[in-house]
């Protein structure tokens, strides 16, 4: 399924709800902390098991923990220490949407993930260089984040 080019919210939602798992993986991205942004030169990455995150929104705001499970079907992640009690009284992980967390530590065990980070960093550097060239080569015209000031 190709991604919808329509501007109709109905069709965008339908595409989101019916997206295949390999495309949902890309939709599970969360922003990186300012320290990681500076270190890796990228703004966001898809969340993976083993990443350490801080919850930024919701009832569990401020909690910090490792991601123990990523559910692509429900588009939710489960964080260590973020639990609720079900009707039987057993603790259960509380599902959190990845847009509501910030990654503070990356799990870099996977070589392919390191390559993805490097590729995204190079792409960003290239974009910044092109923006500087388009602005007449003046470094003041481009802010630190690559936005025109």
Curated annotation (Swiss-Prot):
Output one GO MF annotation.
Answer: rRNA binding
Q: Which InterPro entries match?
A: KOW, Rib_uL2_dom2, Ribosomal_uL24_CS, Ribosomal_uL24_euk/arc, Ribosomal_uL24_KOW, Translation_prot_SH3-like_sf
| Highest taxon of source | Archaea
Which Pfam families did the record assign?
KOW, Ribosomal_L26
Q: Which CDD domains match?
A: KOW_RPL26 (cd06089)
The alphabetical list of record keywords is: Ribonucleoprotein, Ribosomal protein, RNA-binding, rRNA-binding
Q: Which SMART domains match?
A: KOW
One Gene Ontology biological process: translation
Kinase recorded as keyword? no
Query: Which GO CC annotations does the UniProt entry carry?
Result: large ribosomal subunit
Q: Which HAMAP family match?
A: Ribosomal_uL24_A
Question: Which PANTHER family did the record assign?
Answer: 60S RIBOSOMAL PROTEIN L26 FAMILY MEMBER
What's its job? One of two assembly initiator proteins, it binds directly to the 5'-end of the 23S rRNA, where it nucleates assembly of the 50S subunit. Located at the polypeptide exit tunnel on the outside of the subunit.
Q: How does it assemble?
A: Part of the 50S ribosomal subunit.
Protein family per UniProt: Belongs to the universal ribosomal protein uL24 family.
Protein name, UniProt field: Large ribosomal subunit protein uL24
């Amino acid at each position: 399924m190709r991604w919808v080019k329509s501007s109709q919210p109905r069709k965008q939602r339908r595409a989101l709800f019916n997206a295949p798992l390999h495309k949902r993986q890309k939709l599970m991205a969360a922003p990186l902390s300012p320290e990681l942004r500076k270190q890796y030169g990228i703004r966001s990455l898809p969340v993976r098991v083993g990443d350490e995150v801080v919850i930024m929104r919701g009832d569990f705001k401020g909690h910090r923990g490792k991601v123990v499970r990523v559910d692509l079907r429900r588009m939710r992640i489960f964080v260590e220490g973020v639990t609720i009690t079900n009707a039987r009284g057993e603790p259960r992980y509380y599902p959190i949407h990845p847009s509501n967390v910030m990654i503070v530590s990356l799990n870099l065990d996977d070589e392919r993930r390191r390559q993805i980070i490097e590729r995204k960093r190079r792409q960003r550097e290239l974009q910044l260089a092109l923006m500087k060239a388009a602005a007449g080569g003046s470094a003041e015209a481009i802010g630190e984040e690559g936005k025109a000031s």
